[in-house]
């Protein structure tokens, strides 16, 4: 068995991140879609609040399940393979709310679909970060994989922010646009499921018969409290979520303040360009 991560695996890892972050970018337009189908802004906020509470609950639960459940074909890869189906299906369900049903039914549909999407996203997000530790023991290779993932994720954000408004205008509707982009994004995620190898798991099984050290929730919290670099690492997604507010409201700004949705791509560029400059400075 090869002991180093191949170029094909690294490219596949980056492509998975790209597909995943196109899905994440699509959710930035969910608020606009909900109001377009007749759900008021206040009710959209309620839907988001309920889902965020569910998100806080399902993340640690899924982490514990992942530690306890053992598959014959790997620790993380089986979850990633499930996500290739779960994330596009749940994304499409968010953008096909029937316009003719009562408002209450729309809110229920939106809430359940968003909670399902959040669960599906957890299904792909936790394993794609965790699999780095089972692909290689080499710290440089792990850093390389994470860097590749971030680069592809940033590129996905750029592509989604600039092209989605244009694609939507070309295809003529939310449902068609989301279905097409979901199929393309899922295709980007498939190579990772086919070509990645969990070498560390296989070596550990061969060495000690599969014995695995378990950690409690208290151990995890203590580790987080005592490691400032880990705190910074977990703060980064929170900051990124705040930055994504620009993408979420960009279509509203273009539609109601700037005279038309065709301006939305330029609004996205106004957010993305400073982000890229900041990222370049941070690397230095």
Cite the ranges covered by each PLM segment.
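Membrane-embedded alpha-helical bundles of multi-pass transporters/translocases
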Residues: 2-284
